[in-house]
Structures are given as structure tokens and as C-alpha cells.
Amino acid sequence: MRKTKVDVVVIGAGQAGLAISYYLTRAKIEHVILERGSIANAWKNERWDSFCLVTPNWTINLPSALPSSVDPDAFMKKDDFVKLLENWAKSFRAPVMEGVCVSDLSRTGEDFKILTDSHIFLANQVIIATATYQRPKVPQMLRNLDPQWELKTAIDYKNPSSLREGAVLVVGSGQSGCQIAEELNNAGRSTYLSIGHTGRLPRRYRGADCIKWQLEMGWLDRRADFLDDPKKRFSGDPHLSGKNGGYTLSLHELRTSGVKLLGRIVSRDGPVLKLKGDVKTALQASDRYAIEFRRSVDEFIRNSGRTVPLPSRLELHGEPQGSAFDFEEIEQLDLLSENISTVIVATGFEFDFSWVKFPVLDETGYPKTNRGVTSVPGLYFMGLNWMYKRKSGIIYGVADDAEYIAEKVSTSKQRYYSTEADL
């Protein structure tokens, strides 16, 4: 197997990998980016056709990436965002090697050894920018579903016409699950949605987008030690949509429009799913999240002395109406009798860093870092959930972390060559 020695290897060519490449290029540090697919691979191949970003375009603050012609308050479609990342990579000649899958990261002598499907790379420093979401979670009781039902995950789903005829069960009520269920229902498919206790964010409130308020209130700059439980790094994001200019995505509205809401799946006996019967408490949890968010904004406005408009009727869209809780809980669902042909699982993702053969992972297998810097000199991570701040794992935050890590790489490089010169 061919061997190549490079100064720095970056693993992953999404927004995090490209951001670190931008700053390494600016510092004239030799590096290569290894990408298992192509640039922006997850955005390109693991999102449904109509996918839009749920954060406004102004959050795409990658240096020199966003064209001035783009409306900062609009929401970019998937294909447009992919094209933006591709064009950005071309603009600074990002050294991306596509179709190179890394399977092992270890040490050989003084070098990092990166094993791929066709190549061995040796490097002085390595930056892992594969983010947190490597593979979809699938509940145990659904993993061995009979082939007569098509089992898909959110990354497999493309559009309603790509599915078998019949009703569809969507499992999971985070951003993906709710948006997919809405699209299926709007396409005339009989749609069931198994919901959890995920929050709802009002798309806009008191004249500004909810993400703008989060920025203004300092929520995006909250540090990881703000969390009282490290597991909250992986909590499901509240549901909302950037489609058609962006709007509040409400479980109440989905139910009113015809989506059949179900509680959590407890177990399965053949085609019959036993349900927890907790739809009402899940709806209340979603409502509570929205109420608490608005209360936080109101308090922030009062304390800052700002003059902003009162909430409009449209901004309060999605709130429960008079008969919102007037229904009977469903305790079980028979996939056969309900003519369900497809089950789409949208219950989040799992990380897998088992290929990293260094003592830099905690008891759950998640990287332990200080703003991306590990205890192993020369080994770094990028784009992780709450890696340094809340924004570290989203588009808005990767540039700040990339600039910081690039400086660490540069400092380490200078120290490395100074040591060599002294020998």
C-alpha cells in the first residue's frame, strides 16, 4: 500500500474541515483533506430533496464564503448550500482528496498513521473534522422489521414519490421527523408520526428570527460547562422550518392538517407496535419550550431597554387552540391494518470514533478536548457538539474554532521544526 508523508492531515470536507483548511491555507501550512465521499458529502447525499437550512443565511459566516447577493435573512436550499461550499473550497484551492475513507488513526514512530482504503498517510498533525453525526440511530425494536415494510432512516429519505404506495410511519419529532412528516402529509400520504418530548421554537418573535434572539441573548456563546449534564450535548433540536421563507413548525398544526400523532414506541410484536400513550404530555413539553423561549426574549427586551414590536398573531402561530387536547391516546398501532408500507426513522444520530486509537475518548467514546485540542500533541477535533460553545457544532460557530485550532497547529509546527533544527 502506497505511503505519503504530509505535514497536516484533515479528515472530513464538510464546513468544519473546509474552515480549518481555509485558515491553514492562509497560514501557508501544507495539508491535505481526506473525504470519504465528496465536498459537503452529508449535505449532498444525506438530506432529502427539498431540505432547507433552518438557520438564516447570515449564520453562514464562513470567511469570504457568502456572496453579497444572498439575502441574509432567507434560508438556503440544500443544493445551493452544497454549491456554496464547493465554490468556497475552489476559491482558496482546498486540497481535498475525494473518495478516500479513513479506517484507522494510530501512531508509527513519531508520526500519526492514517490508514485509508487504498493509501497510508503519515502526518505530523491531524485534525478530525467528521463532526458528531456518523450514523443514524435505529430503535432496537425496529431493526429486524419484516422486509414487507420498507425501513428507511432520515438520510435515506428523498421525497414522497420515492416511497412505496401506502401509509407512512415517521418515528421521531425533531427537526427532520417533523419536516418529513409534513412533506408526506402535504403530498397526500396517510402519515403517522411517533413523537417524543422535543421542543418547538417560534420561527420569529417580536420582529426577529429566533436564531437572532439566541445570538443576542448570548445562548450561542454558552460554553459546554453551562450544561448540568454532558448528555444534553446530544439533545434533539427543537422543531422549526426554513422552507418557503421559514415558519413555525407545530405538532398541533400537523395534527390539525391530518398527521396522526402517536406516543413513543415501547415494543413490537410482529406488525403491532405498543405505544406509550404520551402524546398529550409530549405536546405540553413542546408548548412549554416555546413559552419559556418567549419569556426569555421578553425578559431580555425589558432588561436591555429596547423598543421592539409586540408579538404579532403570525408570530404566535402554532399555539394550541381550544380542542388541541381533545382526543384519545392510541395505545397500539397495527402496521398491517393501517396499510403502512414504509417506516422512516428520524431519531437522531450516533457518533463512532472507535477508529481513533489514542486515549482521547471518554467512557462513552466521545472526544475529550479543550476547544478541540486533545491531550495528544498534534491531534485535534473540529465541529463537535458543544466542543467549546453551543455554536461549535453548527455552521455559525465553526469558523471561530477553526481559526483558533489553526493557530495551535501553526504554533506546534514551529515548535516541531525548532526541535528538529536543534538535533
What are these regions (language model features)?
Residues 46-71, 210-227:
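N-terminal glycine-rich dinucleotide-binding loop that anchors FAD/FMN and/or NAD(P) in oxidoreductases
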Residues 2-13, 19-42, 76-423:
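Flavin (primarily FAD) cofactor-binding/catalytic cores of flavoenzymes
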